[in-house]
Amino acid sequence: MRLLFLFLALPALCWSQTKTITLEDVYKKGTFRTDPVSASFSESKAPSPSINWDRFSDAQGKKIGRPDDIIACEAKANLQLLRTKTEPIYRRSSKSLLYLFNSTDSSLVQIGGDTKSLHPQFSPDGQYISYVQNNNLMLFHIPTATTQAVTTDGKWNFIINGNCDWVYEEEFEFSRAYEWSPKGNYIAYYRFDESGVKEFNMTMYDNAHNSDYRYKYPKAGDDNSVVEIYIYDVNNATKAKAQYETGDIYIPRIKWTTDDRQLVVFWMNRHQNVLKLLSTEATTGKSSTLYEEKNKYFVEINDDWWFLKDGKHFLFSSEMNGYRHLYLYGLDGTIKKQLTKGNAEVTEVNGVDEVNKRIYYTMAWPRPMDRNLFVTDFSGEKTYALTQGEGWNRATFNEDFSKFILYYSNINTPQTVSLQQVMVDKKKAINAVQEKVFGESPKLKATMRDYGFGAASFIRIPNSKGDTLNGWMLKPTGFDSTKKYPVLFCNYGGPGSQQVANRFGAVSNWHQLLAQKGFIVVSVDNTGTGYRGEEFKKKTYLQLGKLEIEDQIDAASFLGQQPWVDKNKIGHWGWSYGGFMSSLAITKGASVFSAAVAVAPVTSWRFYDNIYTERYMRTPKENAAGYDDNSPINHTDKIKGKYLIIHGTADDNVHFQNATQMITALVKSNIDFESAYYPNKNHGIGGMADNTTFHLWSKKTKWILNVLGNENTLR
């Protein structure tokens, strides 16, 4: 404890300040924009031929303009798919007008007419363009310029083909719900029957009488869409239905093996603690179990699955032994190898070199907040570190894995981008040798010096349960240990998340602005956050919010004992799950937190979607106390300090309902509060053209300065 106190009491490090950070610098002027870097594997890259898009017109003679997106056809280099007039839908989905461009004769063909479509793709053989329009999966045959409908029963809020329903898109993190087979003979797709899913409606304040937006959103305990997987035979125009146990289940992924006739359907029960991979025949839909994993809490779903080109093995990551590691299994079940081990977690697979039988991956090592690059062979017996030390390394490899572009930064230093060569010596040992540096962010570093950016330090704080929590601290400019400063906790805290990271940007420009104003800014990763093993992350199972806020309270109490902290001026702010935490801080944490800002907060998990919520809490019927005991709505009578709640009225993710129900509880408890709402804004509450982003951050900043400021802060 004494060593920890001495570490915390170290003076703040910062550059001499000549300029003052303003909100305009952060949110309008782009003063701290990162240096542009041109990094590639080739020494000289011929510039792409310039195309005058203004000479192309649509069917009505209107200029199409510069495309929003250009999709190349790998099978035929002369073909490109253009997306124009793109509109966002939800977090991962958007719709556009589509055009097929042929660079050989500069011809332009509109695909799908004047109706906007989603998820356009070329087939692997370059014969077709697939897309989703009006909830139906469509195919455009390029040689004959004809369109065929794979499905015809699509209908808004009833049937979806080839695209996800809202909750799958948000929580299973994909939107395009179809996959081409490797050779392009088949296309597997999802069919969602969401007719039994309850609707949620949002008022859009867009005309004299407003409008009503309704969509299917299953809240905790509600019924889900009925999901079916079909495999369409492109050549014969026939389809087979994938066979699996139906009922209250999820299909979080489908993936093809290298065999054009073998689809893998990922099956999961509603509790999400059983995952099965079902090997499914393309022609008949018959299936058999390829892999099964069970967990006493829940199984994490991700895209870390590779079906190798040899047709015999697959690679994947799993927490089955307490930490996320890599495994190599045989498709016939005869081989089961754990390739990586230890108490440091694999965070990303950067590439699989099947020729040399090596896997390149990133680990949270040597500390949970660091990232380093490693390589391991398929036997798991030879492992080499390609980067070392504390900091954050991110890598992109070339096709043959002979080189990679390395992006390195740490919490106080902008990124350096370099080209690294993978070297294999005579004893087959592997290391990386730097070939060249593309950029070291000189302009940003100079700007940081001019504005006197402070240096954040990592801290470790004990909680009352015997764990030690990781955090970072940014002290005020010109820190004086004889003075008392207010503290602002910046927290997200949700399952598997991480804010205490040794990368540039973890401490934001806004944090630096607050430090210049005289605030101590702190972030602490509580119990339930990621990269410290399964048990630390899953301790919060069935009781979201309980241990998390107890950790934040412990950290605030600890800091409040330090002689340079104004214990009566400790605040907490967060967004989304972080807003849930801030609302708990001002209620259950009323003894230590004197102010809180909650932006777009969940205020009761009864109001949130079922896939996310039930993964950690099961259903409200099964776990009523878990839902209610830690809902800030049920603790408003404890509030002693100041509370600001902010929400967008068109938040499709965390509904505005959460704010209204919290305010209802505040009124009932006769608690004074402040609120702000942003009409027609979604969960991100953003917008540069209409000034929303600047307005929100200005309001929040001024409120914090006014409520938490003391004699040692600037207003």
Model regions: which residues?
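Beta-propeller folds
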Residues: 7, 16-403, 411-413, 709-714
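Short beta-strand and adjacent tight-turn residues that come in two discontinuous sequence segments
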Residues: 10, 189, 598
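Sec-dependent N-terminal signal peptides
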Residues: 3-13
